[in-house]
Amino acid sequence: MSRLTVYRDDAPDTILLDVTTPGEIAETLRPHNIRFDRWSAPITPAPDAPAEEVLDAYRPYLDTLMGETGAGSADVVRINASTPNLPELRKKFLSEHTHSEDEVRFFVHGQGAFVLHIRGRVYSVLCTQGDLISVPAGIPHWFDAGPSPDVVALRVFTDTTGWIAQYTGDDIANRFPAEVPVEASGNS
């Protein structure tokens, strides 16, 4: 189940808001220009389906989204136990960073938390299968798919060079709880 949990950035043990309905999540994030939406497809590709099959299943949504955002490319990313250098990759994702373009992800399978650091607040958005999130360029954030990830996601890019992070150097991610339950990190 999708979830948004909001904290003060200096009080990781104090929850200010905790909502689980997609409409409430979207409404809370909208003032920060963060898009949260749900997509459904006529078929749900298997987690190990070829990338082209996954892209084709969501093509109508992707075409609309890419037209709205001016994005130039989309691909499929898989993060699981067989991902090369998984510990190093996870460490990179767990460090607060920004991007020079919007970070757009659609969760085909599994779940992960985008944790956003905005104006003295931390917004932890647990995304699950069927969720779309678009984090605007320049918003400090980190991502956690859990210690045993099993995620398949569509990535949409304007810059065809792909995922490029600018790290903030802030260790804030170390002070906040993981939002992906260990027992559920591979489930949707």
From Swiss-Prot:
Entries under SUPFAM superfamilies matching the protein: RmlC-like cupins (SSF51182)
Classification via Gene3D superfamilies: Jelly Rolls
Site, May play a role in transmitting local conformational changes: residue positions: 102
EC number: 1.13.11.54, 1.13.11.53
Keyword Acetylation: no
Cofactor mode of binding and number, as noted: Binds 1 Fe(2+) cation per monomer. Binds 1 nickel ion per monomer.
Binding site for Ni(2+): 97, 99, 103, 141
Superkingdom to which the source organism belongs: Bacteria
Keywords for the protein's UniProt record, in alphabetical order: Amino-acid biosynthesis, Dioxygenase, Iron, Metal-binding, Methionine biosynthesis, Nickel, Oxidoreductase
Catalytic activity: 1,2-dihydroxy-5-(methylsulfanyl)pent-1-en-3-one + O2 = 3-(methylsulfanyl)propanoate + CO + formate + 2 H(+); 1,2-dihydroxy-5-(methylsulfanyl)pent-1-en-3-one + O2 = 4-methylsulfanyl-2-oxobutanoate + formate + 2 H(+)
Site residues, Important to generate the dianion: 105
BP GO terms, sorted: L-methionine salvage from methylthioadenosine; L-methionine salvage from S-adenosylmethionine
Required cofactor names: Fe(2+); Ni(2+)
Enzyme superclass (EC): oxidoreductase
A GO MF label: iron ion binding
Coiled coil, from the record: none
Function description: Catalyzes 2 different reactions between oxygen and the acireductone 1,2-dihydroxy-3-keto-5-methylthiopentene (DHK-MTPene) depending upon the metal bound in the active site. Fe-containing acireductone dioxygenase (Fe-ARD) produces formate and 2-keto-4-methylthiobutyrate (KMTB), the alpha-ketoacid precursor of methionine in the methionine recycle pathway. Ni-containing acireductone dioxygenase (Ni-ARD) produces methylthiopropionate, carbon monoxide and formate, and does not lie on the methionine recycle pathway.
Family: Belongs to the acireductone dioxygenase (ARD) family.
Designated name of the protein: Acireductone dioxygenase
Organism field: Gluconobacter oxydans (strain 621H)
